[in-house]
């Protein structure tokens, strides 16, 4: 069973967010599960030079895109035992950023078409399944039907489309349909692509793939309803029998942290943040984009009350200016209790994950979320809102059964967040044995990529044998 993994990011070549981790770690885990997998992505100019220099050119060809015929260079690099293919076109990918340019629709329509054209030239590899990720590759299933249905090379190729975040759909003016996509006939109809007068790439991926997955079971249920469906809930309801939720994983820290490590990490963090060295004062943390989706409104609404508790809080992240400014003003008003560090530093982030006692993630919605899983892998206890992958990964602690690995609250309400924090702080300070049991539960939680890969392998096999 051969799988071509079409994605726009893969660490260490390019990473702007969690998708880059998926592009690296899921293929590795799938290969361990016996899947013959290869990854294909754009050759961005931002890829580090040491990797660019090691790439081998396989083929140069042209990619049809409506009235255009665009150059494509197909290159290969083997990394960590995985074959990575890179699609080279300086016009589309020699840019200062991966996303956000004005011709993004054309840029990623080209990438989707180039993925399919490259199948002709992959050495000794004809995929049984093409696994597409988010709107940037969502046209692959549609193009496969529109332009390759009569080509015997493409017979029996199945497509799997994974939604990582439904909020970002790739919506463009209606002119894109003919001028960029080159579609006509039934597959160009409004039912296939149209979205309030525009063209919606994500909609095409959902409608035309053989199977749809998203990144947690709860999110798969949520997006079938208007509040979470971002205007596509009706389309998703129409595919509900082909929709599955599979949690992402996180790389396990090595060596696996212990509670003894936790104490040492806590001391290092206190020293770095200039917090008083006091084991009785819990360190709360938040590592996040500072945007409304992540629950910043809830946090700020009750931040005075949180800081009135005998706690310390560190916030690391960057985002909307008004959230940054308000957090900085709070930090000035609570010196020694609140540290706000704007920006993102990988090393500091992992020191916070490892050294803090409590991790806050009060998101309005969260397709999967990886921060809470990273925190638990270090024995840091999450407080989360019950939504998406947060609900699937964080189980509220039960003092009766001794089961559970964190604290949760249901409604998007600031005082529910405050109550959960008060409850956690009280347990930390007054129920030491219970807190230690909670930490042990968090440390033993399985969020490995191997678990995710086993589920995807089952999906691949189902598609493969349905031919």
Curated annotation (Swiss-Prot):
Protein name, as recorded: Glycogen synthase
Role description: Synthesizes alpha-1,4-glucan chains using ADP-glucose.
Catalytic activity: [(1->4)-alpha-D-glucosyl](n) + ADP-alpha-D-glucose = [(1->4)-alpha-D-glucosyl](n+1) + ADP + H(+)
Entry-linked SUPFAM superfamilies: UDP-Glycosyltransferase/glycogen phosphorylase
InterPro entries cross-referenced by the UniProt entry: Glyco_trans_1, GS/SS, Starch_synth_cat_dom
Pathways per UniProt: Glycan biosynthesis; glycogen biosynthesis
Taxonomic lineage: Bacteria, Bacillati, Bacillota, Clostridia, Eubacteriales
Record-annotated membrane-spanning stretches: none
Pfam families in UniProt: Glyco_transf_5, Glycos_transf_1
One annotated GO biological process: glycogen biosynthetic process
Catalytic activity, EC: 2.4.1.21
Residues where ADP-alpha-D-glucose binds: 15
PANTHER family: ALPHA AMYLASE DOMAIN-CONTAINING PROTEIN, GRANULE-BOUND STARCH SYNTHASE 1, CHLOROPLASTIC/AMYLOPLASTIC
Organism: Desulfitobacterium hafniense (strain DSM 10664 / DCB-2)
Gene: glgA
Molecular functions per Gene Ontology: alpha-1,4-glucan glucosyltransferase (ADP-glucose donor) activity; alpha-1,4-glucan glucosyltransferase (UDP-glucose donor) activity
Listed CDD domains: GT5_Glycogen_synthase_DULL1-like
Alphabetical UniProt keywords: Glycogen biosynthesis, Glycosyltransferase, Transferase
Family: Belongs to the glycosyltransferase 1 family. Bacterial/plant glycogen synthase subfamily.
């Amino acid at each position: 069973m051969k799988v071509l993994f079409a994605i726009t990011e893969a660490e260490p070549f390019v990473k702007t967010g969690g998708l880059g981790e998926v592009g690296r770690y899921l293929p590795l885990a799938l290969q361990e599960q016996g899947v013959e997998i290869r990854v294909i992505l754009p050759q961005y100019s931002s890829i580090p030079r040491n990797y660019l220099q090691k790439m081998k050119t396989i083929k140069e060809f042209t990619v049809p895109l409506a009235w255009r015929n665009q150059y494509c260079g197909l290159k290969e690099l083997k990394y960590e035992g995985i074959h990575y293919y890179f699609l080279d076109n300086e016009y589309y990918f020699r840019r200062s950023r991966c996303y956000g340019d004005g011709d993004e629709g054309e840029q990623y329509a080209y990438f989707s078409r180039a993925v399919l054209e490259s199948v002709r030239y992959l050495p000794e590899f004809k995929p049984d399944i093409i696994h597409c990720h988010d709107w940037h590759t969502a046209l692959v299933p549609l193009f496969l039907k529109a332009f390759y249905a009569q080509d015997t090379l493409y017979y029996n190729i199945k497509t799997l489309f994974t939604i990582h975040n439904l909020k970002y759909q790739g919506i463009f003016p209606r002119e894109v349909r003919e001028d960029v996509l080159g579609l006509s006939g039934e597959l160009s109809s409004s039912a296939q692509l149209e979205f309030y007068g525009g063209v919606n790439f994500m909609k095409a991926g959902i409608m035309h793939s053989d199977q749809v997955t998203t990144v947690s079971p709860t999110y798969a249920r949520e997006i079938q309803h208007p509040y979470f469906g971002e205007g596509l809930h009706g389309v998703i309801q129409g595919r509900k029998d082909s929709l599955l939720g599979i949690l992402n994983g996180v790389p396990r820290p090595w060596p696996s942290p212990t509670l003894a490590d936790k104490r040492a990490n806590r001391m290092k963090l206190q020293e770095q943040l200039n917090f008083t060295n006091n084991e009785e004062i819990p360190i709360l943390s938040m590592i996040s984009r500072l945007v409304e989706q992540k629950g910043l409104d809830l946090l700020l609404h009750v931040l005075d009350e949180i800081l009135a508790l005998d706690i310390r809080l560190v916030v690391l992240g960057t985002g909307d200016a008004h959230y940054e400014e308000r957090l900085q003003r709070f930090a000035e008003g609570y010196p020694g209790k609140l540290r706000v560090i704007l920006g993102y530093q990988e090393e500091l982030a992992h020191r916070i994950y490892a050294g803090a006692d409590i991790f806050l993630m009060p998101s309005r919605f969260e397709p999967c979320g990886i921060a809470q899983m990273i925190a638990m892998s270090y024995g840091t206890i999450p407080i989360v809102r019950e939504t998406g992958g947060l609900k699937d990964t964080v189980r509220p602690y039960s003092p009766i059964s001794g089961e559970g690995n964190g604290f949760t609250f249901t409604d998007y309400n600031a005082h529910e967040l405050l109550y959960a924090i008060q409850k956690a702080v009280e347990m930390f300070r007054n129920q030491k044995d219970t807190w230690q049991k909670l930490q042990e539960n968090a440390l033993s939680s399985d969020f490995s990529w191997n678990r995710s890969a086993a589920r995807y392998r089952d999906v691949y096999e189902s598609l493969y044998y349905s031919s």
